[in-house]
């Protein structure tokens, strides 16, 4: 994308201005079919399937590169272990032991049966301040379609508008509407111990 190419150009210029060879300080995360895959402009290339979006692909090579560089490969390995545990939970046929399925069913009910057009995700931790944006990308990009997987138009709402902020930020802004406004907005409170 233009944004990625602009960022790459900025970093290459900064490295060059510092007297460094960019090809010895930059890596590429791309698909194996990309021209970048065989480029000598990078120290190494890590591959991901071309159908995986990069912005929040935390378990792909995109997330692996960032998390490993920032926190070490051991932390990324632990992250993948946690994701694998969640994958195992999502295969449970008992909806009450499958949090992902339960959340999905509640979301479909709220949007398609009750007709609520939005959902607020309210994490009560500043460390999770970008979590609503993560869910926006996962849910709204995937469900933001007017056709099904066969290209046929659909005649039902495909998903809610997801928004949110940490509780302490939202308390003095949109919480007013949530508490005293005329619309019903489903809320998802996120906490941790």
Give, region by region, the residue ranges found by the protein language model.
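Glycine/threonine-rich flexible loop motifs
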Residues: 2-6
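Active-site phosphate/pyrophosphate-binding segments
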Residues: 7-193
């Amino acid at each position: 994308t233009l944004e990625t190419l602009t960022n790459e150009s900025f970093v290459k210029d900064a490295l060059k201005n510092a007297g460094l060879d960019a090809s010895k300080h930059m890596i590429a995360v791309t698909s194996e079919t990309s021209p970048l895959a065989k480029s000598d402009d990078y120290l190494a290339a890590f591959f991901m399937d071309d159908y995986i979006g990069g912005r929040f692909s935390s378990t792909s090579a995109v997330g692996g590169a960032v998390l490993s560089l920032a926190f070490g490969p051991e932390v990324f390995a632990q992250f993948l272990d946690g994701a694998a545990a969640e994958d195992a939970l999502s295969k449970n046929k008992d909806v009450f032991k499958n949090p992902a399925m339960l959340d999905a069913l509640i979301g479909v009910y709220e949007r398609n049966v009750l007709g609520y057009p939005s959902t607020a995700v309210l994490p009560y931790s500043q460390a999770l301040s970008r979590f609503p944006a993560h869910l926006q990308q996962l849910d709204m990009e995937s469900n933001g379609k007017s056709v099904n997987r066969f290209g046929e138009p659909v005649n039902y709402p495909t998903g809610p508008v997801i928004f949110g902020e940490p509780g302490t930020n939202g308390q003095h802004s949109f919480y007013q509407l949530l508490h005293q406004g005329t619309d019903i907005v489903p809320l998802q409170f996120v906490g941790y111990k």
